Amino acid sequence: MKKLILVLLLAYSMLEALAQNIPAKSTVVEQLRSANDYFMKKWPDPVKTIITNKERPANIWTRGVYYEGLMAFYKIDNQKRYYDYSVEWGEKHHWKPVRGEVYTRHADNQNCGMTYIDLYRIDPKPERLAAIKANIDAVINSGRYNDWTWIDAIQMAMPIFVKLGVTLNDTKYFDYMYKMYSHIKYQEGGHGLFNPKDNLWWRDKDFIPPYAEPNGEDCYWARGNGWVLAALALVLQELPKTDAHYMEYLDDFQKLAKALLPLQRTDGFWNVSLHDPNHFGGKETSGTALFVYGMTWGINNGHLSKTDFLPAVEKGWNAISKESLQPNGFLGYVQSTGKEPKDGQPVTVDKVPDFEDYGLGCFLLAGTEIYKLAKK
């Protein structure tokens, strides 16, 4: 009995020592404010169009991901300016999907609806919910469930279904969400985009073998797998545990998280190519932030072992908050938009990605969960 007590005390001491590497809550908030203030100062008008190789509206998916992060941050740093910035963004886009296309089926163009729903929950004005509800209702009424053909789509649209189901107390959204998830997992590209051998996801059917990385391994893109991990966390935190597919989502979440653990670099980042560290290997913020978000949420909610995952999230957060985050609030090492490891290269600390918003959204999501993990 004395030996058992000693072992338990030692284990507890080890956890306490590890926990000390998580920064204080106040430090996390300062880091998140720094990054967010940099962006809000650069983009004071939330509906100013985004110009890169062409002009795009300000509620495309990249900006939608930013607002996902901002809404999460708002819950721990309750500044009215965050809320006002978000409401103005929604209002001036008339609470509609991208380009006002109420009946778009493209997940990227639906993503902004996630924040519209969050803002409706704060102030339930009907116009905040009407268009995104009409959009998803049309998807359901069509009977088609093969829209998600790339894994990014899981994050872009899947949480909208669960949020609508919870908000409206209507399980039809949960049921159709599973049909769409089941298609991409088991059927898309022939046998689905999830590889049960490695518990990782191919980005789309173009990357299913015989496609391979230069070292002969399967191509698993970090940010793509990060989208899946984040989406599953977002779904699990809202979906009733009584749902018929809750345990499958949880199992997929846990398997993916465990598969990622041994792939983390010693510096805390993950490479853009998860199974070929020499194929554009190096520090990358967005995928790392999504993994930190998912894993930390898993720890905070008892779905992942603190003993196993705390060292990974501690290393990951310290990497992106100390190396990626610059003194002026700029986030370095963000891979530009694309669909595979070679896109947006080179990834460096001072390179401005084609869009600065989605990387920040991922960072805010991760930091919000780290804040909850921190003791004081």
Predicted segment positions?
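Bacterial Sec-dependent N-terminal signal peptides
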Residues: 1-23
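Surface loop/turn signatures of beta-propeller and other carbohydrate-active proteins
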Residues: 34-38, 145-146, 204, 208-209, ...
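Helix-capping and short linker residues that terminate individual alpha-solenoid repeat units
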Residues: 44, 78, 94-99, 124, ...
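Asp-box/WD-like beta-propeller blade repeats and closely related beta-sheet repeat scaffolds
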Residues: 128-161
